[in-house]
């Protein structure tokens, strides 16, 4: 376990969640869906840097799921969008940690699963909290 990667990811997740606040009213903003949609690009770049085009092909196939989920979340009502994003971010954290069990992308840095995984998990939990507050407010009128 790379403690430095975990700490850096934790700090970055807090910075992101404080900068990209979700408004309490209105539609879903594009920030969190767009951020989730960019995550596959990192793995694509890792595969390209290692000249591993088999891994690139697999990463593109998997990445299409995250991009589609982001788009669908953006199109839905705020509460449903937040729930979909929560699933997306937490799911991507699991993907980061279990990535090497699925296939090897030789360009991925050793510290990446901890770094990206903690960011994804923290943002997913933050969005779950925001979804619960949003649902509570809408049910109380």
Regions found by a protein language model. Give the residues of each.
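Hydrophobic transmembrane alpha-helical segments in integral membrane proteins
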Residues: 1-12, 52-55
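Juxtamembrane "helix-exit" motif on the non-cytosolic side of transmembrane helices
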Residues: 19-24, 45-50, 97-105
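Membrane-helix boundary connector in multi-pass membrane proteins
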Residues: 76-83, 87, 95-112
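Cytoplasmic-side transmembrane-helix entry/capping segments in multi-pass membrane proteins
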Residues: 26-38, 58-62, 82-91
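A loop-to-helix transmembrane entry motif
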Residues: 47-64, 113
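Membrane-interface helix-boundary motifs at transmembrane edges
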Residues: 20-32, 51-54, 75-79, 133-140
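N-terminal signal-anchor/start-transfer transmembrane helix
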Residues: 6-25
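Hydrophobic cores of alpha-helical transmembrane segments in multi-pass inner/ER membrane proteins
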Residues: 9-15, 65-68, 118-130
């Amino acid at each position: 376990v790379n403690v430095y990667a975990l700490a850096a990811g934790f700090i970055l997740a807090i910075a992101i969640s404080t900068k990209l606040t979700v408004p309490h009213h209105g539609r879903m903003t594009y920030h969190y869906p767009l951020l989730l949609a960019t995550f596959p690009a990192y793995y694509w770049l890792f595969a390209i840097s290692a000249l591993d085009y088999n891994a690139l092909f697999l990463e593109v196939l998997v990445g299409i799921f995250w991009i589609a989920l982001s788009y669908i979340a953006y199109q839905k009502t705020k509460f449903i969008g937040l729930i979909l994003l929560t699933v997306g971010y937490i799911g991507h954290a699991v993907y980061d940690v279990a990535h090497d069990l699925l296939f090897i992308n030789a360009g991925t840095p050793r510290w990446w699963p901890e770094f990206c995984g903690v960011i994804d998990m923290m943002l997913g939990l933050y969005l779950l909290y925001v979804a619960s507050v949003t649902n509570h407010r809408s049910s109380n009128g």
